[in-house]
Amino acid sequence: MSKEEIIQAIKGMSVLELNELVKACEEEFGVSAAAPVAVAGGAAAGGGDAAEEKTEFDVVLKASGSEKIKVIKAVREVTGLGLKEAKALVDGAPKPLKEAVSKEDAEAIKAKFEEIGAEIELK
């Protein structure tokens, strides 16, 4: 079977079949499909210009400001937390709101909270 035939066979598979294929390959060869991601992340962190290449950010609530109720509502909306948990997060600031989010999402969350007077930091 040639590479092209294998590729054509893979193209014809459903997502469920592809998932089963990946699991079977992991078992057969004793590897994990997630391992290369961890290795690549470690290599990027060791580079000198890793800060310029950062693609994931943590959104941290530094202070709630004067509109605490609006901030609690926004925390619930962004995180999906219940009222009690959202209030505890706001009361315990500085606390992380969301972790490992894309730059666009992090900027949108920051803008939303700053609009209602909260202080947000992106890490």
Curated annotation (Swiss-Prot):
Q: How does it assemble?
A: Homodimer. Part of the ribosomal stalk of the 50S ribosomal subunit. Forms a multimeric L10(L12)X complex, where L10 forms an elongated spine to which 2 to 4 L12 dimers bind in a sequential fashion. Binds GTP-bound translation factors.
User: Per its record, how is this protein called by name?
Assistant: Large ribosomal subunit protein bL12
Keyword terms, alphabetized: Ribonucleoprotein, Ribosomal protein
Q: Name one Pfam family in it.
A: Ribosomal_L12_N
- Identify one Gene Ontology CC term for this UniProt entry: cytosolic large ribosomal subunit
Matching entries from NCBIfam families are given as: L12
Organism of provenance: Clostridium kluyveri (strain ATCC 8527 / DSM 555 / NBRC 12016 / NCIMB 10680 / K1)
Biological process (GO) annotations?
translation
Q: What does this protein do?
A: Forms part of the ribosomal stalk which helps the ribosome interact with GTP-bound translation factors. Is thus essential for accurate translation.
Protein family according to the UniProt entry: Belongs to the bacterial ribosomal protein bL12 family.
Question: GO MF terms on file?
Answer: mRNA binding; structural constituent of ribosome
